[in-house]
Amino acid sequence: GRIAVQTAKQTMQQRLRMAEKEMLFEEFKDRAGEIVSGVVHRFERSDVYIDLGKFEAVMPSRERVQTEEYNINDRIRAYVVAVENEGRGPEVILSRSHPHFVRRLFESEVSEIADHTVEIRAIAREAGHRTKIAVWSKDDKVDPVGACVGLRGARVKNIVRELNNEKVDIIRWSDDPKALVEEALKPATIRSITLDHEKKIVHVTVSEEDLSKAIGRRGQNARLTSRLIDWDVQVRRDESQQQRFNDRINSAAHGLGEQLGLSDELAAKLFRAGGITLELVLEMPADYIASSLEIPEPEANEILAKAQQLTSA
């Protein structure tokens, strides 16, 4: 009799749990794509289980932001990725790393997005580090970037706070890939952009000093821009600028070399050592000229004598 009662009790508990899960599924099946708020309830390996009030949801390891730490009883907001009703019964899957989490935060924070005056055209995210979001306005009088930033940056600050200080770049959308790349790679100044429509590659040329800005830390800026516009963005330094600079140096060095009777190679070495004019050559010690040009010191003295002769003439 006791075993039968125990079995009946276990069966009843299982049915109750199943009924609760079915209620969960019915309540949440249409809420995929929303943001919900809950309390961290427990951990199972790297998965986080979150109490949503009546029900428990799970944020799997793959949906976590790797730079975030969670503790029991922490209140967190998350995006409902899916409501599944398979194998183990109904389950609510949450995410804080999904790009649509950022999308929904903007929709709740920016009234112009909520009323569809401003549209989010594209979004690319490396959760915990950086997000790029491209926005467009139906109304010419409404600045889409300004609307998202808010007065004194209030709107975007609220979003960044929710994302634990993840960088958020808000970009003006353009149907022209060139214009969009130029916006997305700011603050780097673009020297030239060429498009390979067949391979969907954007070749971007920047100056030496802008190269690291355009590529970003560990290539992040260029990588996110590629995802944002759905083209492969390849950034390279402007070699022609360097070539023009080298040509000017070589030309000036050649002129100096002709005056002093030096080969182009020695003249270039002298020029790079600081001997840009005859007057500056005369200020250089003979031993310094000798070591810079890799010549014996008597030859360095001959160069100085020639420079002295030319300036005195």
Q: Which residue stretches match the model-derived regions?
A:
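RNA-contacting regions in translation and RNA-metabolism proteins
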Residues: 1-313
